[in-house]
Every structure is written in C-alpha cells, then in structure tokens.
C-alpha cells in the first residue's frame, strides 16, 4: 500500500491518491470527516483553523459506499485559497504585482525548511518552499489514516492517541487501556488528568503572550495486533523501523520511542524485558509491556506503544535573527500566521500516520485483494498464537 499527496498550503486544494486498500471495505465519508475535524482542534491553534472546514471528497476508488480495490482519490479544499487566488494561482503574474501583494519571502525562519529548501530547488522566493513544507499537508495524511482506521476496525484492531507532555508539563506515564479510551478527547489538550490540562493551557498562553511556541510529546497505542507482523530477517522489514520513519516524517517531529523508550537505558534487563506467559484461551502474552508490543522488529501481540517528540513550531511572533537572501543583511525572520502550540493536533496526525504504517504492514504480511480474505488470514494468525 502507498499514497501520494499534492497541493500547497494556500493553493486550491490538497489531493491524495491511496493505492492498495482491499476491495469490499465499507467506507462512509462522514467517518473520515470526523477524523479530519479532530485534527483542526486543540488548544493553541492559530486563526487558519477558523477559516478552514476540512472535509473530504472521494472522487475515485469507492462506489456506493464500498472500495473497489482500485486507487482511491480524495480531495480537501483549501477555503483560504479565496484570499490567495492570484498569488498562488497557476497563471503568471508580474514582479510588480508580486511585490504589491507583499507575499515574497526572502528572510528564512530558523528551524524551518525555508533556507535549505530554497538552496536545493533554486527558489529566490522562499514562499515556494514553505507552501509545500507547511504542516497543512498533514490534512491529506490524516485522510489517508482515517481510511486505514476503517480498515483496522474491520480487523478488530484499535488505535488511539493522547498528549503526554507539553512544554515540560507531563501527564501520567501510562494508563490502562480502558481508562485511556474512556477519556479520549475529554479536553482540548488531549490529556486525561484535567488538572494537568489547565496547567498546559496556562503554559501555552504564556508562550503565546511572549510571541513564542512550545512543543511536547504524544503517544499512540495500537491494540489487538496479530503476532509476527514485521520481520527480524531484514532491516527494512522491521515494523518498529517502519513506524519510526513514519513518525519522524511528520512536520516538526524530532524523535520517536516505543514502550518505555529512553527510560530503558536507566534500568537493568530484568526490569525491562517482558516475561512470557501462556493462557489456553488467549495463547501467549507478556506479563508487562515495557517494550511497547515489539520484539525483534515484529509485533508480539501486546499493545504497540509509540511515543513521538514534537519540537516547538519554528514560526515565532517575536522572530529570531536571520539573513535576507538577496541583500545578505541581518534581519528578523519572516512572520507567517501560525500556531503557538500544535501538540494536541499533532497527536491526531501521529495517530493517523501510525494507522497507515500498521495497515501497510498488515497488507504486506497478509497479501489480500479483498477484505474478507484479509480477515480470514488474520484470524488464522491469531489462532496460531494459541496453538503454537
């Protein structure tokens, strides 16, 4: 399975083509739009989300509510394009018109793709870089992940996410799955402890008032995975490697870990390895889950726990020092409309990116043309965990 996105932040639309979704999967566009709406929320978001009403239009690959097995094309319209029609349109404009619109960018932002992207593609107007490197593209990725979540639901696989930390303020390390799921989206920073939520809001307000931004840590949990998805045989087939690549490909994500993650470096092996147990009804399982459901590059049947680190957004309303690429003189970096904190929204993006990686790995493990074939193969693998 694979997908390709296209579109600029202030262009007319985002387009995504997904290939490899099995036939006969029931799809309701409102289920996808429900996930799209979640991405737009979260405390600390900027004015852009007051303009956009992200909804998906499916233009191929689905007929009368069911997938065909052919590529699925989805379109997300950028409502803000009405304010950018001339500057972001395909038709040529004069340099005078461009200058009068004051949309040309020559002062790159530290921490963004602006300068290096301009060098790589020889763009003297850095807007050509930031329009594509913008996190607006993640709307298309959430649409893909929403499709994958529908697929996973048909396989009895749950996936959900939360915020673990914002600006150094931390929620509890982990909750049991029932508490986790019962309290999803109970507040606008996506943590479970409401007292922690208010402290995070205060931290976000403080950063906003100072013209600054803050980052944090998000967590994604995948439950009821069949064992043995991935491989120990080759490096490029390891499931944790694939998930890690997906997570750090999200805008502003700088790190990823599984289970207890970097805390494993502080403990002896006897406190980190998960003991193997057996029950005649469910088969093999682990007495703990320090490793986050992954052993030897494969799923072991325990919940897969993924932690992603998001740096603060690089656009600052009190900008850092930069250099004008035309004059080479010192200037403050360009200010673009932005969020002060996008960690709650990023947890939704991360959830959907992981959903794609999980669905892709399942379809590589159990090659299937239609959903019924996939369901049978996964049922057989789950039975193997009991009978082996």
Swiss-Prot record:
InterPro entries: Chorismate_synth, Chorismate_synth_AroC_sf, Chorismate_synthase_CS. This is Chorismate synthase. Pathway: Metabolic intermediate biosynthesis; chorismate biosynthesis; chorismate from D-erythrose 4-phosphate and phosphoenolpyruvate: step 7/7. Reduced FMN (FMNH(2)). It catalyses: 5-O-(1-carboxyvinyl)-3-phosphoshikimate = chorismate + phosphate. Its cofactor is FMNH2. Homotetramer. Its EC number is 4.2.3.5. Keywords: Amino-acid biosynthesis, Aromatic amino acid biosynthesis, FAD, Flavoprotein, FMN, Lyase, NADP. FMN binds at residues 132-134, 251-252, 296, 311-315, 337. It comes from the Bacteria. NADP(+) binds at residues 39, 45. Disulfide bonds: none annotated. Belongs to the chorismate synthase family. It is an enzyme of class 4 (lyase). One of its GO terms (molecular function) is FMN binding. GO terms for biological process: amino acid biosynthetic process; aromatic amino acid family biosynthetic process; chorismate biosynthetic process. The lineage of its organism: Bacteria, Bacillati, Bacillota, Bacilli, Bacillales. GO terms for cellular component: cytosol. This reaction introduces a second double bond into the aromatic ring system. The keyword Amino-acid biosynthesis applies.
């Amino acid at each position: 399975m694979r997908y390709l996105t296209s579109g600029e932040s202030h262009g007319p639309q985002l387009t995504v083509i997904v290939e490899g979704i099995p036939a006969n999967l029931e799809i309701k566009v409102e289920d996808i739009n429900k996930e799209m709406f979640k991405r737009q929320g979260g405390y600390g978001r900027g004015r852009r989300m007051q303009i956009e009403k992200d909804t998906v239009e499916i233009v191929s690959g689905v007929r009368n509510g069911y997938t065909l097995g052919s590529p699925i094309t989805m379109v997300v319209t950028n409502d803000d394009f009405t304010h950018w029609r001339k500057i972001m349109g395909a038709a040529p404009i004069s340099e005078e018109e461009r200058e009068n619109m004051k949309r040309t960018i020559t002062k790159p932002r530290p921490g963004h793709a602006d300068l290096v992207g301009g060098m790589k593609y020889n763009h003297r107007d850095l807007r050509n870089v930031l329009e594509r490197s913008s996190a607006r593209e993640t709307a298309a990725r959430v649409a893909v992940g929403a499709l994958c979540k529908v697929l996973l639901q048909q396989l009895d696989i749950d996936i959900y996410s939360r915020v673990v930390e914002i600006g150094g303020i931390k929620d509890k390390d982990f909750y049991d799955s029932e508490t986790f799921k019962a309290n999803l989206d109970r507040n606008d920073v996506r943590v479970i402890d409401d007292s922690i939520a208010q402290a995070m809001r205060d931290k976000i307000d403080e950063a906003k008032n100072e013209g600054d931004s803050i980052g944090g840590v998000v967590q994604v949990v995948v439950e009821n995975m069949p064992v043995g998805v991935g491989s120990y045989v080759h490096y490029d087939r390891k499931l944790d490697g694939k998930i890690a690549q997906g997570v750090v490909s999200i805008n502003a994500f700088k790190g990823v870990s599984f289970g207890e993650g970097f805390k494993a470096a502080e403990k002896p092996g006897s406190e980190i390895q998960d003991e193997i147990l057996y029950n005649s009804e469910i088969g093999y399982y682990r007495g703990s889950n320090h490793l986050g459901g992954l052993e030897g590059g494969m799923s072991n049947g325990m919940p897969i726990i993924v932690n992603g680190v998001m740096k603060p957004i690089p656009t600052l309303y009190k900008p850092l020092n930069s250099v004008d690429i035309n004059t080479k003189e010192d200037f403050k970096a360009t200010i673009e409309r932005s969020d002060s904190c996008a960690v709650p929204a990023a947890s939704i993006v991360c959830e959907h990116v992981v959903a794609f990686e999980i669905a892709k790995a399942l379809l590589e493990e159990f090659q299937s043309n239609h959903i019924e074939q996939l369901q049978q193969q996964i049922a057989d693998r789950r039975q193997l965990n009991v009978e082996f």
